[in-house]
Every structure is written in C-alpha cells, then in structure tokens.
C-alpha cells in the first residue's frame, strides 16, 4: 500500500472556476427565470446564500462539493434545454408546465438532487433523438 505522500495529488480546480461556475449558474437561473428561493433549493443552499450568489457576492467552490456539483448540473440542464428548444421562453414554459413523463413540473422536481438528475437525464434522452 502506498504511503499518503506517494499518492498523486487530486487535480486542482482552476483558480477562476468558482467565479466562472457562479456566473454561469446566475445566468442560467436568470434566463430561465428561476426564483432565488427555488435556486436555493436546487443548489441545496440557504435562501440568503442564493441571494448573495445572485448578487455576485458569493461564489460556488469545489470545496463545497454538493452545491458545486448541483451548480454544474443546473448549467448542463440549461445548455441541454438551449440546444433542444433554442429559446429561453420555450425553456421557461417547459420547466413550469406539467410533464407526463416526469410526473410533475420539471422545476418542482429539480428542487431535489435526485430530481435535478432525473430532469437532466430526461432532457438528454430527448436530445439524443435529434
């Protein structure tokens, strides 16, 4: 068994990764008109933290793994919706409409980590058909 000192270091995130992901999450939430309280539930952070994120005074960080990963998933979902629907208004309507395949509105489902992943897989499956 290798000693801890002999193990390769984990890859480090780029110093600006937090600012980049935070801005991408802010932009995605803004374009999709996701309210701050819903964004807080999607990212698993407090409403105050979501408010600071939207104001640009808080940055997501790889050290805070859960919110980091959920932020990445939200941006992936936005990009997939953009590729599939091509217009923010259509994506907003899709997020807030009842969806028989998902059993509820995608936005409501996204408020849990499992639900966000489920919505992302659903959208990616439809993207794969194109």
Predicted regions and their residues:
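Non-transmembrane "mature" sequence context
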Residues: 1-130
């Amino acid at each position: 068994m290798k000693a801890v000192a002999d193990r390769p270091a984990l890859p480090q995130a780029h110093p600006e990764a937090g600012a980049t992901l935070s801005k991408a999450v802010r932009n995605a939430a803004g374009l999709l008109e996701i309210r701050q309280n819903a964004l807080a539930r999607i990212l698993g952070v407090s409403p105050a933290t979501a408010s600071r994120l939207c104001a640009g005074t808080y940055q997501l960080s790889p050290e805070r793994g859960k919110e980091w990963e959920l932020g990445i998933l939200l941006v992936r979902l936005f990009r997939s919706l953009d590729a599939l629907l091509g217009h923010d208004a259509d994506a907003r309507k899709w997020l807030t409409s009842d969806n028989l395949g998902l059993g509820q509105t995608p936005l409501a489902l996204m408020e849990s980590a499992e639900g966000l992943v489920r919505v992302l897989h659903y959208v990616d499956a439809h993207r794969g058909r194109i």
